[in-house]
Design a protein with these regions (language model features):
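Residue(s) in the substrate-gating loop at a strand-loop-helix junction
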Residues: 49
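Short, flexible catalytic-loop segment of classical short-chain dehydrogenase/reductase
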Residues: 92-102
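C-terminal helical subdomain
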Residues: 89, 104-141
């Protein structure tokens, strides 16, 4: 995960973060989708993040990159319906991984192993968006309804 303060201080760091977490994902998806479109079937599963749902103070550059990918997937999903290609946006919450080793862990953290079964289940059920763990759907619903006048004052 990119360092937010470094991204704010140096546009090149923000640019790198957006390329790594956003544009590289879209470029890879483009290559895969071309093959799936030719096959006229398939499923593309992409891991984004709940961070892409609202610009939060601690990580808005990372969140912007993930929002870009989720928006891309939403449009792609509609454009590939006729080709029998299913697009899945997996939105994990706080996951204990090499990317998050520097962060303090708490109650809402999960391991990759603990969320994998729900992701596999969601793919099998042809879900469009999978929150992992599923309680993040409710958390993000609440985060997204906080009025901007309040949200801009809190660091969550």
């Amino acid at each position: 995960m990119p360092n937010q303060e470094a991204c704010q201080a140096d546009y090149r760091k923000a640019d790198d973060a957006i390329r790594v977490n956003g544009l590289s994902v879209i470029s890879l998806c483009t290559e895969i989708v071309n093959q799936l479109r030719t096959q006229k079937k398939g499923t593309l599963v992409v891991i984004t993040s709940v961070a892409g749902e609202r610009g939060r103070q601690p990580n808005f550059v990372y969140g912007a990159a993930k929002a870009m990918v989720s928006t891309y997937l939403q449009g792609l999903r509609g454009s590939l319906m006729k080709d029998n290609v299913h697009i899945v946006d997996v939105r994990p919450g706080l996951i204990d991984s090499p990317m998050t080793t520097h962060l303090k862990k708490g109650l809402l953290w999960s391991s990759p192993e603990s969320i994998a079964p729900s992701i596999i289940k969601g793919i099998g059920r042809k879900r469009h968006i999978i929150y992992a763990p599923s309680y993040w759907r409710l958390i993000m619903l609440l985060v997204c309804v906080i009025p901007e006048t309040i949200f801009k004052r809190i660091k969550i």
